[in-house]
């Protein structure tokens, strides 16, 4: 049996100087960052990243806001159970996020910062609890079915269809996470940042979530998560009067400019900034531009108080 390797936290501590917090979720340790005090800003990461991706934004906001950044189960510093003991599905991710926010007893309006899969997970949570949401900050993500006639990149299709080969490639050789280090940044990442992003995915057992996220992409109605995505897609207009900031890297092989156009079609009042010098990891490529924009947006939009009620069927 393959032995699980420990994560060398000290190797990236200089870039990620945050205290670790853990919550029990159905017997598994759910890791999160909880820095600062004030109005809560909850940041939700995607695949194959973890809370490390938001480190610069945490450091910028935590002097005035309470920044809460979980690692999904199977990601970052959270436990990485096998697929028999944990259900690596979209709905479970939303349940976990909901459990964390309930456990922290957050009473103030929440700003959701969402990237990649975080858009689906965060928006699903928001539809369960629209009265708890104050603002949205979106970065190269989606929360709707693919735009009309939009093909899924061949890389993702192959991982989904060629399961034995994909398992070997993703869990055995870590090709998805390693490839993301080069493909998802337009400017290129430093050696230290690459090491930090990939550190939690250092052995077969620790890469299961990377594989499961891709396998759960909702391409057809046969996918277990398709119904939940469709429900979000059909109800996004609930947030039409919520303050929304969209920051977009133009060089994204999945969430390209067509996805940005779809967001703008659905939310014409959103504040939008797109960056020709950035890719999918937009916060890595242009943090010096995005962080001041986010700070200004939060200052200018204190949020709205009257919320409609909508509860998602569990």
Task: State the predicted function of each range.
Residues 1-21, 30, 53, 68, ...:
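Flexible "cap/lid" subdomain of the alpha/beta-hydrolase fold that forms the substrate-access gate
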Residues 303-314:
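Short polybasic linear motifs
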Residues 278-287, 291:
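Catalytic histidine-centered segment of alpha/beta-hydrolase-like enzymes
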Residues 33-80:
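Conserved HGGG/HGGXW glycine-rich cap/lid loop of the alpha/beta-hydrolase fold
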């Amino acid at each position: 049996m393959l032995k699980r390797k420990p994560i060398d936290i000290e190797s990236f501590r200089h870039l990620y100087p945050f205290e670790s917090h853990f919550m029990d979720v159905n017997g598994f340790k759910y890791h999160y960052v909880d820095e600062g005090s004030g109005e809560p800003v909850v940041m939700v990461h995607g695949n194959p990243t973890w809370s490390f991706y938001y480190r610069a934004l945490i450091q910028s906001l935590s002097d005035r806001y309470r920044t809460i950044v979980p690692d999904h189960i199977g990601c970052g510093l959270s436990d990485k159970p096998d697929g028999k003991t944990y259900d690596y599905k979209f709905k479970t991710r939303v349940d976990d996020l909901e459990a964390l926010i309930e456990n922290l007893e957050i009473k103030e309006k929440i700003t959701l910062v969402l990237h990649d899969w975080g858009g689906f997970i965060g928006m699903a949570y928001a539809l369960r609890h629209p009265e708890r949401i104050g603002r949205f900050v979106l970065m190269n993500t989606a929360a709707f079915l693919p735009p009309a006639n939009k093909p899924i990149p061949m890389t993702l299709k192959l991982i989904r269809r060629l399961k034995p080969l994909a398992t070997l490639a993703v869990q055995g050789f870590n090709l998805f996470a390693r490839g993301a280090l080069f493909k998802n940044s337009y400017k290129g990442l430093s050696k230290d940042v690459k090491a930090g992003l990939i550190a939690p995915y250092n052995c077969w057992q620790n890469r299961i979530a990377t594989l499961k996220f891709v396998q759960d992409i909702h391409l057809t109605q046969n996918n277990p998560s398709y119904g939940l995505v469709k429900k979000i897609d059909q109800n996004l207009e609930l947030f039409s009067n919520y303050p929304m900031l969209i920051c977009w890297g133009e060089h994204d092989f999945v969430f390209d400019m067509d996805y940005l156009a779809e967001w703008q079609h659905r939310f014409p009042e959103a504040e939008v900034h797109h960056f020709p010098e950035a890719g999918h990891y937009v916060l890595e490529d242009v943090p010096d531009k995005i962080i001041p924009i986010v700070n200004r947006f939060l200052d200018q939009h204190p949020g709205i108080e009257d919320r409609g009620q909508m509860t998602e069927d569990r």
